[in-house]
Amino acid sequence: MTIALTDKNTLRETARKNVDQGAVTEGYDADRQEVLRLLNDSLATELVCVLRYKRHYYMAKGVKAHVAAEEFLEHAGQEAEHADKLAERIVQLGGEPDFNPDSLSSRSHAEYKPGSNLKEMVYEDLVAERIAIDSYREIIQYIGDKDPTSRRLFEEILAQEEEHADDMADILEGL
């Protein structure tokens, strides 16, 4: 059985067209503007999560605060890595990552809820992770096979968000 792939000469010729579009080739099937919007909204979500986790790290108090604070700091770093990867993908697709602090909160899937004590902080972090999980699942479904690179990026981030939610659920149970 022979698979019908594009012949080499056609691939070479097509690759020379629209070179100014970088990684976005004629074979890109997704609605690029919509994917860029989803990536930028997810970038806002990750940045809001970084800020919330950082605040919680510094504000955690109580007998069991040490364990939670370590998780808050670790998660803040991982959320920042997610933001960096999303920003890189936005640029690869010819967009501009939106780091505007004035609109972060309104574009973020999750809200910035500071919490007034350790239990509320952990609870709000768990809620935010659950929101991110559902948002990223929907984005993965929407993208499907039209943009495998963005889909894989969201799948990687989703896996870590699920770990974060599990961590927060464990800590909350112990409070």
Protein language model features and the residues they cover:
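Iron-associated oxidoreductase/ferritin-like identity signal
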Residues: 1-175
